[in-house]
Structure formats: C-alpha cells, structure tokens
Amino acid sequence: MVLSAADKNNVKTTWDKIGGHAAEYVAEGLTRMFTSFPTTKTYFHHIDVSPGSGDIKAHGKKVADALTTAVGHLDDLPTALSTLSDVHAHKLRVDPVNFKFLNHCLLVTLAAHLGADFTPSIHASLDKFFASVSTVLTSKYR
C-alpha cells in the first residue's frame, strides 16, 4: 500500500503527538487484541498476557519501538523492517491475519486516546500505515 505525502505527514504528526505514550498505547492495543481475539494468545504462550502484566508492557515497548522505526523510514519500510520480517516469517510464523487484528485494536486504542485529533483523515492514514507495516512483516512468508 502506497502512502501519499499527506498520509506520511499525518502518520508523523500523530506519532509525534503520541510521543512517550507509544509503548503504553501499544500495550493497551495488545490487551484489546488478546481480549477480542483470544486465538492470538497462541503465539504468546510463554508470557503473561493478562492486562497490565510486565510481559505485555515489555512486548508493547518492542512493538512501539518497531513502529517508531517504521515512522522514521516511511519511504523504505522493507529495509527498515527486514530483520523483523525475517523473525516473523521464519521463527515466529505468525498467521498474517493476526496483524489485521492488532492493527484494528491499535486504531481503536489510538481513537480512544486522541479524541478529536483522531480525524477521518488521520484514521485513514494510520490504517494505511499499519497495513503497510503488516505487508512488510508478512512479505517473506512465501
């Protein structure tokens, strides 16, 4: 999915607004995903997926850091996320549908926290961004 100049600006501006809350919001999104789509817990049998757990917070930080890297490399996501793509394809073997679940839960979480700043334009741009990241992370599955 191609991000337009407006999408890139929306993503960068929104990520700047999120600032130091990225790990917290992503952890909340993960909790939403595990609650709404319990089959996603399959890939996390080795950690405590209960709401607010240290494991959820730690994984939220990992995902937030990866997304922050992606925001900084919007023009070359495949290179920026290459190692992470290898891990998801060859080691973790996460079913690609789970990325869609997480994307949805992240959008819901961001909408709740950003309020009026979560405009239809921001929503669309973030949706495209998360879909682009997911596409890169699943690109090496073949």
Swiss-Prot record:
One of its GO terms (cellular component) is blood microparticle. Keywords: Acetylation, Heme, Iron, Metal-binding, Oxygen transport, Phosphoprotein, Transport. Coiled coil: none annotated. The keyword Cell membrane does not apply. The modification Phosphoserine is found at S4, S36, S50, S125, S132, S139. InterPro entries: Globin (IPR000971), Globin-like_sf (IPR009050), Globin/Proto (IPR012292), Hemoglobin_a-typ (IPR002338), Hemoglobin_oxygen_transport (IPR050056). SUPFAM superfamilies: Globin-like (SSF46458). Heterotetramer of two alpha chains and two beta chains. This is Hemoglobin subunit alpha. It comes from Cavia porcellus. The gene is HBA.
